[in-house]
Design a protein with these regions (language model features):
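Short beta-strand elements that form the blades of beta-propeller/WD-repeat-like
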Residues: 71-76, 118-124, 158-170, 210-227, ...
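Asp-box/WD-like beta-propeller blade repeats and closely related beta-sheet repeat scaffolds
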Residues: 123-173, 188-196
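Repeated scaffold domains used in trafficking and secretory/extracellular systems
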Residues: 61-64, 106-111, 147-156, 198-207, ...
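Blade-loop segments of beta-propeller domains
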Residues: 52-56, 61, 90-117, 124
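Short coil/turn segments at the loop-to-beta-strand junctions that recur within blades
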Residues: 53-55, 96-104, 143-150, 192-197, ...
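Blade/loop signatures of beta-propeller domains
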Residues: 20-52
Length: 373
């Protein structure tokens, strides 16, 4: 599975990416000259947690991982499935099944766990926003006033549902919609960027919304700005001046232009750092760390080992824990790179050296947890 561009829905994200005079931008050309920090410089030792499933379950294509105090909830695609694992990696249960009956999902696009009410939320293209208890019991479906089908979302500390609307043709009214538990619209951020799609697209592995310490951060796909969101307001927080940024014309036929562009692919923030994974032309990815103590940005060499090229990337987050997944079959090499048996064996030897024995191409994915030093 390609780590970043695994599954494309026929949709496009269109949110205004205008710069604000309130924000100091970082010039990406300067970042390329920044000093380099290793994985060990930035994080405590990585925790590796091999998942343990049975032959009847396929979890090789992971779209989302939610971590709670006692579990991992994992959303997979091809086939669709939602699984609950203990923190030691053992399978506890499945969450519902794919189907048309009440309480079953058809095409889930995101999951989120609310610690406040101990509820797992599942957004589904066909069903809306479904709610399950922590043990997987179906509770209800939120009757949304919006008509948008494909969503990414977070649950605020107050219990509201903050959706990132993934647009279809570049002419939708809203960018973010904030809903009550009853499905009423509390706030929304209008979409100010309109275009005609030649080839509608979306990057489902780009998670536009993050939440840390009660703050909701928002980075529209293909946008160079990260915002803080609150009650219908977007406040620019970080911006990056990319020499090869994405334009409105690029969005009309994104597949034809992506290989020559630069944009934020993944981001996360904790009390110490801002973490960035930048799509940097020709299908390359570069990692950066903004240290809050001194405001210095460094490049990140986040390879697990010098012996092979698999990197840690902050794909998901639970408070101060940053989460990634290692797929033993691909060792997270993208489809533009050759995966040799030698590289796989070096990866498996490294895992053995950190206490993860017996990994093969057929092994289940391995959760990787990192926390800043």
């Amino acid at each position: 599975m390609n780590k970043y561009i695994g599954l494309f829905f026929c949709l496009a994200i269109v949110i205004s990416c205008e710069h604000s005079s309130q924000l100091s931008s970082f010039d990406y050309k300067d970042l390329k000259k920044a000093p380099v920090l290793s994985l060990e410089d930035v994080f405590e030792p990585i925790k590796f947690i091999p998942l343990k499933t049975t032959e009847s379950h396929n979890i090789s294509n992971i779209l989302k991982v939610c971590m709670t105090e006692d579990s991992f909830y994992i959303l997979t695609v091809n086939p669709f499935g939602i699984f609950r694992f203990a923190l030691d990696g053992s399978l506890i249960s499945t969450i519902s099944v794919e189907g048309r009956a009440e309480g079953e999902y058809l095409i889930p696009t995101d999951i989120a766990f609310s610690k406040a009410d101990n509820v797992l939320y599942v957004t589904d293209i066909a069903k809306g926003i479904m709610k399950f208890s922590s043990d997987g019991t179906y509770l209800s479906t939120v009757s949304s006033t919006t008509k948008y089908k494909n969503r990414q979302f977070v649950i605020s500390d107050s219990g509201s549902i903050i959706e990132n609307v993934l647009n279809v043709s570049g002419n939708e009214r809203d960018g973010i919609v904030e809903l009550s538990q009853e499905g009423d619209t509390l706030n929304y951020v209008p979409n100010n960027l309109f275009f005609d799609c030649v080839t509608p697209i979306a990057l489902p592995n780009h998670h536009s919304l993050r939440k840390y310490a009660g703050e909701v951060l928002y980075n529209p796909s293909y946008c160079d700005t990260i915002y803080s969101y609150k009650s219908g307001q977007l406040i620019p927080k970080y911006a990056f001046n990319f020499p090869h940024h994405i334009t409105k014309e690029d969005l009309r036929d994104f597949y034809s232009n992506i290989s020559d562009k630069q944009f934020i692919m993944e981001f996360a923030e904790d009390s110490k750092n801002l973490y960035l994974s930048i799509f940097d032309r020709s299908w390359n990815y570069s990692h950066y760390v903004l240290k809050k103590t001194d405001g210095i940005i460094c490049r990140g060499d986040f390879r697990l080992s010098d012996s092979f090229d698999t990197e840690f990337s902050p794909r998901w987050q639970n408070e101060s824990w940053l989460i990634d997944v290692l797929d033993p079959s691909t060792i997270n090499y993208g489809y533009t790179r050759d995966i040799t048996d030698d590289a796989r064996q070096r990866a498996y030897s490294y895992l053995s050296s950190v206490g993860i024995e017996g990994i093969t191409m057929e092994s289940d994915p391995i959760i990787m947890l990192a926390k800043a030093k």
